[in-house]
């Protein structure tokens, strides 16, 4: 399965991380599980447009959204309109959406 990951570098946890290293690590973990992941790291101001591009990409089977509740909410709406599966990567302050779904709040565990 091919995922496109849109990672909001302005989201809580991501603000303090080396995003290039994280994206490379996440792509490697997906490959180890027989999937592919293409990470796109974006600023919050560019998030909606990139989510829309990713959901419209014919090579994508699912969208991985990384960020806080605002990022995940925007991604959910776009995925719904495109009838696309959404994977959640909690990287905000509260991560209420991820908590309600039982997604692990530690990034490494959520990626795995």
Stretches found by the model and what they are:
Residues 1-63, 73, 77, 108-111:
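ATP/NTP phosphate-donor binding region
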Residues 9, 66-68, 89-91:
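Glycine-rich beta-strand-to-loop/alpha-helix junction loops that act as flexible
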Residues 17, 88, 102-105:
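Residue-level detector of secondary-structure boundary/capping sites
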Residues 43-44, 68-69, 103:
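Short beta->alpha junction loops/turns
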Residues 61, 65, 87, 100:
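Short gly/ser-rich anion-binding loops that grip negatively charged ligand groups
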Residues 70-75, 96:
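Short glycine/serine/threonine-rich phosphate/pyrophosphate-binding segments
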Residues 82-85:
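A short helix->loop->beta-strand "cap" motif at the edges of active sites that frequently abuts
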Residues 93-112:
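Short, glycine-/small-residue-rich phosphate/pyrophosphate-handling segment
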């Amino acid at each position: 399965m091919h995922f496109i990951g849109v990672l909001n570098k302005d989201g809580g946890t991501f603000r303090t991380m080396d995003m290039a290293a994280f994206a490379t690590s996440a792509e490697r973990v997906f490959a180890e599980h027989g999937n592919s992941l293409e990470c796109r790291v974006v600023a919050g101001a560019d998030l909606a447009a990139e989510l829309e591009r990713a959901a419209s990409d014919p090579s994508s089977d699912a969208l991985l959204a990384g960020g806080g509740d605002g990022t995940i909410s925007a991604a959910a709406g776009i995925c719904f309109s495109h009838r696309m599966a959404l994977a959640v990567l909690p990287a905000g302050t509260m991560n209420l959406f991820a908590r309600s779904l039982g997604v692990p709040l530690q990034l490494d565990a959520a990626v795995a």
